[in-house]
Amino acid sequence: AATRLAVREAKRLTGKDAPLHIVGFSNGGALAMKYSLDTLDNAELAKPQRVILISPMIGITSFARFSGLAGWPAFLPAFSKAAWLNIMPEFNPFKYNSFPTNAARQSFLLTKALQKQIVADARNQKLNSLPPVLTFQSVMDSTVSTRAIVTALYNRLPDNGSEIVLFDLNHAVRFNSLLR
């Protein structure tokens, strides 16, 4: 609902004829992709002309399905910190540092629903109406599954100009001389 509200407000401010490019990072990438897929079934939603994803949460580790269990001890006051996978100072305005167990569970459920929708839309040939998707993904990402982005999304996309940019560390460079 938040994504639909944001797009509706953006279109109100820019005018209905302005192009719509949706950009999403991590969980926002999953929401951007979900919205784009939802437009294939709902003509009232503004259709994007381009989808740009940065480390999109198309899939995460399967252990996230059990993250809700990790928070159960938090019902006892002495174990209240169990509701969090990690608690850190919040200094980054673009990313939460602390992560509640329920957020991990909700992220897992979102990725499963998104993957199911992608499969159904591919089977029904609806992905042919999807705008081009441009994705930037680090192969070193420990949260988002690069494999899921390729297998669950890109292997199902039509030949519409969609691209994935994978990047990694330069393992050949030696930094020892810089650190002396």
Segments the model singles out, each with a brief description of its role:
Residues 34-38:
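Active-site signature of alpha/beta-hydrolase-fold catalytic machinery across serine-
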Residues 51-63, 169:
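Active-site nucleophile loop of the alpha/beta-hydrolase fold
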Residues 23-28, 32:
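Gly/Ala-rich beta-loop-alpha elbow adjacent to hydrolase catalytic centers
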Residues 59-118, 179-180:
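The alpha/beta-hydrolase serine catalytic core
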Residues 14, 39-43, 157:
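Active-site catalytic pocket residues across diverse enzymes, especially alpha/beta-hydrolases
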Residues 95-180:
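Serine-hydrolase catalytic core
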Residues 2-14:
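Alpha/beta-hydrolase active-site loop
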Residues 22-24, 54, 136:
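Short beta-strand immediately N-terminal to the catalytic nucleophile in serine-hydrolase-like folds
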